[in-house]
Swiss-Prot record:
Protein name per its UniProtKB record: Dihydroxy-acid dehydratase
GO cellular component, one term: cytosol
Membrane-crossing residue ranges in chain numbering: none
Species of origin: Salmonella gallinarum (strain 287/91 / NCTC 13346)
Alphabetical GO biological process terms: isoleucine biosynthetic process; L-valine biosynthetic process
Keyword Iron-sulfur assigned: yes
HAMAP family hit by this protein: IlvD (MF_00012)
Pfam families, per the entry: ILV_EDD_C, ILVD_EDD_N
Amino acid sequence: MPKYRSATTTHGRNMAGARALWRATGMTDSDFGKPIIAVVNSFTQFVPGHVHLRDLGKLVAEQIEASGGVAKEFNTIAVDDGIAMGHGGMLYSLPSRELIADSVEYMVNAHCADAMVCISNCDKITPGMLMASLRLNIPVIFVSGGPMEAGKTKLSDKIIKLDLVDAMIQGADPKVSDDQSNQVERSACPTCGSCSGMFTANSMNCLTEALGLSQPGNGSLLATHADRKQLFLNAGKRIVELTKRYYEQNDESALPRNIASKAAFENAMTLDIAMGGSTNTVLHLLAAAQEAEIDFTMSDIDKLSRKVPQLCKVAPSTQKYHMEDVHRAGGVLGILGELDRAGLLNCNVKNVLGLTLPQTLEQYDITVTQDEAVKKMFRAGPAGIRTTQAFSQDCRWDSLDDDRSAGCIRSLEYAYSKDGGLAVLYGNFAENGCIVKTAGVDDSILKFTGPAKVYESQDDAVEAILGGKVVEGDVVVIRYEGPKGGPGMQEMLYPTSFLKSMGLGKACALITDGRFSGGTSGLSIGHVSPEAASGGTIALIEDGDTIAIDIPNRSIQLQLNEAEIAARREAQEARGDKAWTPKNRQRQVSFALRAYASLATSADKGAVRDKSKLGG
C-alpha cells in the first residue's frame, strides 16, 4: 500500500518544525493524516484566458476541504502568446513551458503534496502542467478556464464572427479603413477565456479531455457560462476520491500515466487530426509522452494522419464556427463519437471519472445520450456581453447541432475531407519531418512549387512581406527560429497574417524551423527538423532555389542534387564557430534564453531538453 507523500512532513517527532509551519498555514491536528492536494492555479491579469481564475482556485480548494482533503494553492507563470507575438517577447513563450513544468515539480515535491488539480487554460500553461503531471505521476485532474466567446460585429450589413487573428489581418491590410480596423479590434476578443477558435489553447484543453485527464465538456464549455462552475466543483470532489483510491486502496488506475496511456495518446492525436487542431499540439504531445515514458513519436503521428479524416472545421480554418459552436455540436465527445463509429479509436481507456470510453460516449455523446442534463449542458451558449467574469451568464441555444451531414461536426460519410487536419511531411531538408495544418490550406495549393525567399529572422520576413518584396508564387523560408536557433521557437502568426493582408494568402507558401500560432492558416509549414542551428539542411537553402511541396504525398523537397547540397554543407562547416548561425541577424539573447537553447532539442523531439547532455 503506498504511503501518503505528505506524511513525510506531517508525521513523526522529527517533523515538529514542518508541522509547526503547516499550522501557521491554518492546518490543525485533525488535518495531519488527510491528503494534501495542490491546487495548481495560473491566475494572472496579463492574460484574458487567465484573468478570471483568481477565485476559481478558491472554489476548488473549498470543495477539496469539504470532501476530506487539505487544499494548498499556488500559481505558475502564464505567457499570453498573442500579446508576446511579433516582437522579442515571443522568444520566451515556448521556454516558459519548461519553467511551468519545473515549477510544478518543485512546489509539489518540495512540499510532498499527494495529488493535484491543475487549473490551466492558455497556450503553454496546459502543456507545462501536463508534462509535470506525467513526470510526477500522482493523481491529477485538469480543469481549464474555458474558451472565450467569439467576437461579433456588423460589416457590410452582415454580422460576422471574429477573433484575434481577424484584428491582426485587418490592422495590417492597407485597404481597410482606420474605422473598420478599430471596429474589428474592439469586437474581436469580448470576454475572458482562451481565444475563441481552435487555436493552441483550446486544442490542448480538448486533448486533455481526450487523454482522460479532464471531465466531459472541459475543452469546449465557455468560460463565461454558469455551467462551467460545476466542472470546478466536481474536480475538487473527484480529486479526493482519486487520491484515496490510490493511497488507501493501492489502485494504480488512478494515476495519470495509467489514464494517459499510449492508447490515450493515440486517441488524443486522432482527435487533433480530426478537428484540425493547432500544430503546436504535436510539440506538446511529444513532450508529454516523453515525461510519461511512452514511446510516441512523429512516426506515430504520421501514421495516424494518413488514415484519420477531418470531421470538424473551426476558426481559423473557417469563419463560420468557433468553440461555442463546437460545444453546441457536442464538443470533444461529439467528435470522439464519430471517430468511434468510424472504428478509429482505442476504446480500452478510462478517464478521471473512472468511466471507459464507451461508457463516456454512451452518457455524453449528444447523438446517443438519453441524459437530458447532458443535452442541456451542451446547449450552453454565448451571451454577447463583454465581461472578465467567469460563470457570469446562463444563455442557451434553442437546440443542439446534431446535424452530422452539414453541421459543425461531421460523420465519416460527410467528412470535410478524407485527409485529416494535420499532416507530417518529409524531404531532403526535413529529414525528421515537419508539420502542416492541412485544415487551413486551400485545395488549390495542396501542391505548390516556387522559388525560395530566405530570411534569417521573423522580423526580416515581415519587413519584406509588408515592403512588397514577396510576390505571388514565392516560398518564404524563415530559418534559425527553431528551439535552439531562436532561441525559443517563435510563432510566425504575423508573417502568415501579413501574407493574407497583402493578398498572398493563397499565392505563397511559408516554411520555417519555427512554429505557428494555432491561429495560423494557409500553406504554412513549420517544425522543420533538424532545425538550422542543429545542422539542418534548411540552413543551406539560398534565394531562388526551387522548393516543391506535395501535401497529398507527404513530401517537401529542395530541388538540388546531393552534390550541391554536400558542397554547401562543407562551406557552412568551414565557417568554424560561426557555422549553423545566422550571418547578419542582430538579436539580443538573454542568459535565461541561452540556457534554454543549450539543452533544447529540435521540434521532432517535442523541443524538450536533451537529457543526454545532463547524463540522463
